[in-house]
């Protein structure tokens, strides 16, 4: 499986989003459209990004009763995006329904389950979610549920990736957000790592936002991170 960097387009407006994408000229990217961008601007965001030939990870983190998620995914299938996220906490019937909706629509969109957010610490999880286990065990449990329910993969931090890979096999997609370079600030993420860490532990994709979008030269920073992720421990500055 080819390793790819997904750029998080965490912009509030379509105008700022397209202004950023136009800096990459002919380069075809894999980009993440999150709730802020999609809900504030609507489906036109998807249309404009697709017009430019970029792949889309629509990160809506759907979580509702199975029939509602099935119907929502059926509606989103018409965009023929590359990846869509749902919450593993929605349970097996919800996960199965989301995957079934894409299959029935005849599209190849990958359905990926969110495990624990990288902004969640173990203390947060125990106090606020009342899950009295380690965060690693919680993530591995959600990953097992996702695989058994037939979805294509999970989103997790790098910290759990190696064990998910061992548990779920080589074809299972693992997406790591919370990726930073050593000199970057953590922002609101708590469980973070570098592109080289993600490569070493077996991630399929990494999601990088501010490290690229907030850089004075985003094209150069993107290529640096791409090289680091593709080469892993073989990367030499």
UniProtKB/Swiss-Prot annotation:
Q: Which residues form the active site?
A: 61
Q: Which Pfam families match?
A: OMPdecase (PF00215)
The UniProt keywords, alphabetically, are: Decarboxylase, Lyase, Pyrimidine biosynthesis
Catalytic activity entry? orotidine 5'-phosphate + H(+) = UMP + CO2
One annotated GO biological process: 'de novo' pyrimidine nucleobase biosynthetic process
EC id: 4.1.1.23
Question: Keyword Transferase: yes or no?
Answer: no
Q: Name one GO cellular component term.
A: cytosol
Q: Which domain of life is it from?
A: Bacteria
Physiological role: Catalyzes the decarboxylation of orotidine 5'-monophosphate (OMP) to uridine 5'-monophosphate (UMP).
Hey, which family's this protein in?
A: Belongs to the OMP decarboxylase family. Type 1 subfamily.
NCBIfam families per UniProt: PRK00230.1, pyrF
Q: Fill in the subunit field for this protein.
A: Homodimer.
HAMAP family noted in UniProt: OMPdecase_type1_B
Q: What is this protein called?
A: Orotidine 5'-phosphate decarboxylase
């Amino acid at each position: 499986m080819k390793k790819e960097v997904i750029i998080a387009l965490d912009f509030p407006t379509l105008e700022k989003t397209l202004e950023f994408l136009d800096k990459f000229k002919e380069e075809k990217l894999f980009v993440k459209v999150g709730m802020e961008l999609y809900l504030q601007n609507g489906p036109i965001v998807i249309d404009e990004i697709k017009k430019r030939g970029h792949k889309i990870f629509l990160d809506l983190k759907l979580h509702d009763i199975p029939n509602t998620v099935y119907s929502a995914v059926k509606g989103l299938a018409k965009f023929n995006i590359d990846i869509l996220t749902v919450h593993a906490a929605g349970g097996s019937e919800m996960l199965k329904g989301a995957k079934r909706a894409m299959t029935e629509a005849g599209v190849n969109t990958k359905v990926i389950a969110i495990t624990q957010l990288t902004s969640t610490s173990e203390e947060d999880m125990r106090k606020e979610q009342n899950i009295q286990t380690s965060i690693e065990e919680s993530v591995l449990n959600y990953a097992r549920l996702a695989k058994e329910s037939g979805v294509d993969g999970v989103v997790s931090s790098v910290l759990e990736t190696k064990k998910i890979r061992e548990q779920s096999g080589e074809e299972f997609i693992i997406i790591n957000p919370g990726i930073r370079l050593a000199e970057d600030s953590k922002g609101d993420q708590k469980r973070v790592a570098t592109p080289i860490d993600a490569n070493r532990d077996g991630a399929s994709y990494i999601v990088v936002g501010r490290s690229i979008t907030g850089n004075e030269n985003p094209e150069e920073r993107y290529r640096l991170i791409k090289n680091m992720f593709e080469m892993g421990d073989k990367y030499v500055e």
